[in-house]
Amino acid sequence: MRRIGIDVGGTNTDAVLIEEGKVVRAVKAPTSEDVTSGILDSLQRLGATGVLASGRIDGVMIGTTHFINAVVQRRHLTKVAALRLGMPASASLPPFCDWPEDLAELVRGGVWMVEGGHEYDGRPFMPLDEAAVIKAAHEMKAAGLRSVGISSIFSPLDPSHEKRAAELVGEVMPGASITCSSELGRIGLLERENAGLLNAALADLARDTIAAFERAIRNSGIAAPLFITQNDGTVAEAGQARRLPVYSFASGATNSMRGAAYLSGLADAMVIDVGGTTTDVGQLRNGFPREANSVVKVGGVRTLFRMPDLLSIGLGGGSHVVLEPLKVGPLSVGYRLLKEGIAFGGSQLTTTDVAVASGVLDLGDKRKVGHLDSATCRKVFAKAASMAEEAIDRMKTEAGDVPLIAVGGGAFLIPEQLPGVSRVIHVEHGDCANAVGAAIAQVSGECDQIFKDMTRRDAIDAARTIANDRAVAAGADRRTLATIDSEDMPLAYLPGNSVRVRVRVVGDVAAG
């Protein structure tokens, strides 16, 4: 298969062509403020090398910062109607109750709370008040709202009330964008509801962004399906990503970790991804990033997404360097490195300037950094290594030395030996590991649900079937699906041999 992987970073937009498992060509383009033109630029640079003319492209995989930027920067968000099924319970904590006020003001289009929902064991808490749902939908329509987030108590156990409410709202508001929380989160009403509301707020941006990506691909003369990378290191076809954009919040660092695993051939290792501004440290398990088990805040909003467990520090190739007293980062010149770095005619001393002065990098004009002696350079590199060492130690989950894969454009800051590390692996094409990770990504499906009145084996099989179906819906080839994570927990306080099962599967992208 021939695939193009693109990853948008804070400094560069990287693009690679992978054919039959090998990196054929890699290019970098400056990240543009609107992101999309940077992607088009990277595709054009890749095409200019001539490698795209020799055969069909099977897919273009893009990792984008559009959606997380919209939430963090409070821009391009749509007003959302929040419909919660749970009355008379849950009234004391209405939708948006734990949001930052500035973000809530932007997104909150109205709140409607009606009877419905289920108990913790799946029994109906209250019958769904369909008349109240229809009345709410008419009020939403009259208010000019076109995006709706629906949540229901314990909907991951039984999503039937959410689905029925979505049908009723769709009949009153044809063409509206409707998000059901049961599609997004796990057990935990507020966090799951928040995920649904954020997703609904991104509906218009997701539609416009993915349409722009598809235009960029067409304008580059490439006839290939578009896939968007997700938080867990997998991809979803464009239609699925358009419907569930929140799954693509934190794909950049995840892509780098997947790319590191692919380029090194290691499935279990620590990974340090040194970019232009920040360094991300995480751990690979079975070739995928270890997931965070805690609540994840996105733009100040509590959610329960599938997110990688990462530690970020202010160290990168564009980090500011202060010599007296010695300080590296957290400020960075970012994508302005080629203008502001001393080696390129600017006035700001950066880690890249130090690397040029010491001969580690052959960039810019070495004469401009001739005032940096070898002792000074060694001190700066030692400081950077100390920062990396501390971050790695904080992310390790077991005693002893572990292998470390160093990737990213700033990987020159990581020395060949570090305390607590058995070996440091610098891989070919490591500076574009993020784009490689996007290009080789598979498709995933997950189920996290409580089952009752069945054996443990039947519950696990049922969860696996649901996860498989979700993966296929996201664009996976059913024949290639494999389970990469499975856990079950008997719930003694619930009737009917209740067991909570979480299963995650991955598979290759379906051909065609």
Please give the residue ranges for each predicted region.
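N-terminally biased helix-coil "hinge/interface" segments that flank
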Residues: 1-512
